[in-house]
Every structure is written in structure tokens, then in C-alpha cells.
């Protein structure tokens, strides 16, 4: 009888679905609605979905039961996917994302650095296929605001070709090559 061990790269069945997207649950909150007859308990879930190649989406779901809330959040995340320009598993340049009181600073990192980021940001980077990045959360630590601030920052990432076209210069002038 052999003992099977689970490596860090092995995906759980609920993490990879048939469509090839990676899913991560960021947070689940128990919420209460107070009515005349008492309290109604429910759950709110925040999830992120990515393809491992630069696309990522976030979704929120609410329900009276956790699995339904998570499923609703996953479905919304799949519908709200956005594409981010990556280079060798990291960003092209440093960027700051903002949402509400949350600010997120993201900086490209050299090969072998890994993902140095806190909870909600780490989940986003793992599902979208970023392997080397330095990120810091400034201000609010609310997971919803951090996820939105991270996506705001990622939407600001531009390739050297995009910057060159905007400035009317060649790519070599922009990259300094």
C-alpha cells in the first residue's frame, strides 16, 4: 500500500474545472438581515477566476448557503474576466491600483522571486499566471477593496509597444535597447 502525498502544484477538484479556469475563494462572510420576526442568516462569497495566461475575473455571490454563494460568485467571475499584459510571468512595470481607501502597489520581480503578496492579492496572481511579483497593500485591508484595487492596477499595465505608439516613438527608444 503506497502513501500518496499532495504536492503544492496539485490542484484540488474544485480549483480546476472542465473549462481550464483556475478558481480561488478569497473570502466568505456570514451576513445577517434583521427582520420583524428575528434574524435571517446568509453568506456572501468573494472569488477570483483565471486562466493562468493573464486573464482574471472577480465575482461576488450571496445566498442562504455557502456552496450556492460560492457558485454564484464563480459564475459572476467567469463573466467579468479581463485580460492583463504579462511578460515572463510578471508585469511590464510598477503600478499602483486604487479603490476606496485601499491602495495596492505592484512591482515586477526577477525570475525565482515568487509571489510576495498578501492574501487576496496572492489569490489573484496565482489564478492569472503571475509567478514573480512584489506587491504591497496600503490603506484598507478589506478583501473586496483589495481585489478591486488590484484589478484596477492590473488594468493600467501597458506593454512597451502600447507606450511607444502613444508617444509616437519606436519600441527601442522606450525600452532603452
Swiss-Prot record:
Part of the 30S ribosomal subunit. Contacts proteins S4 and S8. Residues 21-84 form the S5 DRBM domain. With S4 and S12 plays an important role in translational accuracy. This is Small ribosomal subunit protein uS5. The N-terminal domain interacts with the head of the 30S subunit; the C-terminal domain interacts with the body and contacts protein S4. The interaction surface between S4 and S5 is involved in control of translational fidelity. It holds the Pfam family Ribosomal_S5_C. GO terms for biological process: translation. SUPFAM superfamilies: dsRNA-binding domain-like, Ribosomal protein S5 domain 2-like. The gene is rpsE. Keywords: Ribonucleoprotein, Ribosomal protein, RNA-binding, rRNA-binding. It comes from the Bacteria. Belongs to the universal ribosomal protein uS5 family. NCBIfam families: rpsE_bact (TIGR01021). GO terms for cellular component: small ribosomal subunit. GO terms for molecular function: rRNA binding; structural constituent of ribosome.
Amino acid at each position: 500500500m503506497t502513501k500518496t502525498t499532495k504536492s503544492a502544484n496539485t490542484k484540488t477538484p474544485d480549483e480546476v474545472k472542465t473549462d481550464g479556469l483556475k478558481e480561488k475563494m478569497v473570502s466568505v462572510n456570514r451576513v445577517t438581515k434583521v427582520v420583524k420576526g428575528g434574524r435571517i442568516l446568509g453568506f456572501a462569497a468573494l472569488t477570483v477566476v483565471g486562466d493562468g495566461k493573464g486573464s482574471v475575473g472577480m465575482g461576488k455571490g450571496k445566498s442562504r448557503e455557502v456552496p450556492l454563494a460560492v457558485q454564484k460568485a464563480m459564475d459572476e467571475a467567469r463573466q467579468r474576466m479581463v485580460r492583463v499584459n504579462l511578460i515572463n510571468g510578471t508585469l511590464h512595470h510598477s503600478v499602483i491600483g486604487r479603490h476606496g481607501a485601499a491602495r495596492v502597489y505592484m512591482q515586477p520581480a526577477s525570475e525565482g522571486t515568487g509571489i510576495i503578496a498578501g492574501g487576496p492579492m496572492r489569490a489573484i496572481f496565482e489564478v492569472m499566471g503571475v509567478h514573480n511579483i512584489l506587491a504591497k497593500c496600503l490603506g484598507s485591508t478589506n478583501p473586496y477593496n483589495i481585489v478591486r484595487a488590484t484589478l484596477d492596477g492590473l488594468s493600467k499595465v501597458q506593454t512597451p509597444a502600447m507606450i511607444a505608439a502613444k508617444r509616437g516613438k519606436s519600441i527601442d527608444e522606450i525600452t532603452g535597447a
